[in-house]
Amino acid sequence: MTLTEAKRIGSRQGLISVGLGLLIAQFIMTLMISTDEGFVKGFFWFTDIDYWINILIGAIIMLACGHFYGQIAGKLILIRKWNFVLTGFLIGLAVILTTTFFASWTGFIQEGIDNIGTNDDPFFDYIFKPMYWVTMFGLIPALIIGAWFGGRTKKKGKEKHGTQQGV
């Protein structure tokens, strides 16, 4: 297994895992909103909010993080033989925290900068609070999807390694 192959496998599995995470987030939001508004309105919840650009930027950042951190995970799991469950969990946590941190700056720039010097604390409101809540609600999904991601990365690495040796 070369480093390039390990990174490619990790990147692909990272992007698949991020896609799964985004689908789960969409499903959760649909369920929460559809209880009051109906399924169609719940499914298209993002069309009725003022911060859709923040969601879009967050999704793009999350995909980039999935690619970048996935490469790191591929190297750690397939080359260095780290524990795939722990590595997957830590990488999953890194993806959601990095995404939250950078996506939060969108709201800070849009609204928070105007509140600097007032009684409001824009850094706390736009950076710290999202980090806190994503950590609280994202810990268990990061563990589950991260472990699944680590297992798939390890499995794909074994499949790739086995086909190269003629097994």
Cite the ranges covered by each PLM segment:
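Juxtamembrane/disordered regions of integral membrane proteins
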Residues: 1-167
